[in-house]
């Protein structure tokens, strides 16, 4: 039986519409609290404690209060971190030996969306069976704990400062960032009071943008999903590099001094090359079905095995664990370095890239010399919820035609989003015009069949 509420990255939707409503989120907090309280890891006679962090959406206040009430009703204590990047919640949950962490965020989505995602005590995303147990509790009546058994809530002192120090600890002690001018784009999101301090305290001349959240402007024309603002700022300020995070700061895009943008695929290659230089060998790395073919070829040329996971950082993580490897990434900017953090972290990933540049004495362009990405065209087609795109003969025919034309010189990938009713059509080809033409033909077939 499939999960009803949990997608690839927690529970997400439009605020005010199921399931992102205050009554549902209260019941979700209660259900999660009951599952935690019944865990074998909670000592008899003690009560679990969870950490709640959020991004800067106006709805975060409402959902935070609802979650807090639900946990308290289940007899679970709550610590409130306030605005905090998703990887910051994962780190603090592990560092403070808490029972779980919860993030209120819809990541790169606009302000009118929000979501809830959970981390286990070790800072990893919840396993499927735990999410299933929470969903099962949602069907049960809410039975409030007795007055002397209610959970308590308190603010976590200096949550931001604790996480800042963790981020800095992942940068080599022998290095500093003095002499570097960096533009840091925080997407008006959760890292707005954190990321600029990390890079400044390591010595960089920091020019922050996207650091004036008002509850409504998260990811709006700024951040990792809208890098044009960063490109302009890097050029205008004659900066050495630009670093763009998304709303919850688990994604990274980098811009060099010329305005060239580097995505997660390219940054993965840079980190693997750096690891080879320092450790002598990297057995393998993980990308996704969307990873550019040129990166796979380049890694294999370096003697590095490459595995493609399903799209979603949780699936990249699964493959890394299965193979015992450290480095993986998505083109969207989720980068995993498991010897540094248990989850994707935009700030930590940026520091790893900067350390690689320091060690090599090269620019990003120089480190990627010889890696020419195949042109890709990605079209997101919004569908009616529940539309049967897999059963459409017209969509299948369009895909077959494109694959036949690109045989041996490109790829076609069609997949449904795990967080919204969108079908992602991606075509990769040696010639950009071919990628665009085939992607648009398939997208037209999808629109005709599903809207």
Swiss-Prot record:
Q: Does the keyword NAD apply?
A: no
Sites where Phosphoserine occurs are at 107
Q: Which GO terms describe its biological process?
A: carbohydrate metabolic process; peptidoglycan biosynthetic process; UDP-N-acetylglucosamine biosynthetic process
Residues holding Mg(2+): 107, 246, 248, 250
For the protein in the UniProt heading, the enzyme class is: isomerase
- InterPro entries in alphabetical order: A-D-PHexomutase_a/b/a-I, A-D-PHexomutase_a/b/a-I/II/III, A-D-PHexomutase_a/b/a-II, A-D-PHexomutase_a/b/a-III, A-D-PHexomutase_C, A-D-PHexomutase_C_sf, A-D-PHexomutase_CS, Alpha-D-phosphohexomutase_SF
Q: Which UniProt keywords apply?
A: Isomerase, Magnesium, Metal-binding, Phosphoprotein
Q: Per the record, GO CC terms?
A: cytosol
User: According to its UniProt record, which cofactors does this protein need?
Assistant: Mg(2+)
Q: EC no.?
A: 5.4.2.10
One term of GO molecular function: phosphoglucosamine mutase activity
Give the matching PROSITE patterns.
PGM_PMM
Task: Give the positions the UniProt entry annotates as the active site.
Answer: 107 (phosphoserine intermediate)
PTMs per UniProt: Activated by phosphorylation.
Details of cofactor binding: Binds 1 Mg(2+) ion per subunit.
HAMAP family linked to this entry: GlmM_B (MF_01554_B)
Q: Which function does this protein serve? A: Catalyzes the conversion of glucosamine-6-phosphate to glucosamine-1-phosphate.
UniProt similarity note? Belongs to the phosphohexose mutase family.
Protein name per its UniProtKB record: Phosphoglucosamine mutase
- Origin organism is Burkholderia lata (strain ATCC 17760 / DSM 23089 / LMG 22485 / NCIMB 9086 / R18194 / 383)
